[in-house]
Amino acid sequence: APQVVTLGCRLNTLESEIMRSRATKAGLNDTIIINTCAVTAEAERQARQTIRRLHRDNPAKRIIVTGCAAQLRPEKFAAMDEVDRVVGNSEKMDDGLLEGPGCEAVAVSDIMESPRNFNVPMISGFAERTRAFVQVQQGCDHRCTFCIIPFARGPNRSVHPSHIIEQVQTLTAN
C-alpha cells in the first residue's frame, strides 16, 4: 500500500486519509506522500528531514510532497534530489496528484484563487486512527501578522452543511 506521512494539523490528518484512499485505489504502492506543515520554521525543517530519511530508507519509491510547506515554498522542495513531485494544497485533493512519473514536477497554483464553495471528498473511515475528523471549513480571511495559514490555505471557504452531515453519518456507520 502507498505510504502517507502526515506532519501538522488535524486538517492534514483528514486530507492524508483521503490521499491514502485514492493512492491505494490507483495502485501506487511505490509511492510515499508527505503532507507537510508550515506553521513554524521547525515544522519545515522536520519536513525536509523526514523527506531525506524516507528516501534513504526507501530509495526505489517515488516521493510526493504536499501540504502547507509545499504550497508556500514549492521551489525549495522541488530542488531536493529526493523529491519526485511537489503538489499544492488546491491540487492535492485532485486525482491529478496520482499521475505517474511523466507528470509535471511542480503543481502548485495560487491558493488565493480557490473557489469560495467546495466539497471535500467523502471517506468511510480512518485507517490508523480511532478518532475521525470532519472538515467544515478551510482557509482564513484574517491577516494576523504572526500567522502564515491564510497564505498556505487560502481564503475562508465553507463546506456545504449537507455534505458535513453526510460525512458524519458515513463515519459513524463505520
Residue ranges of predicted features:
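Proteins enriched for Cys/Gly/acidic motifs involved in redox and nucleic-acid/cofactor modification
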Residues: 1-174
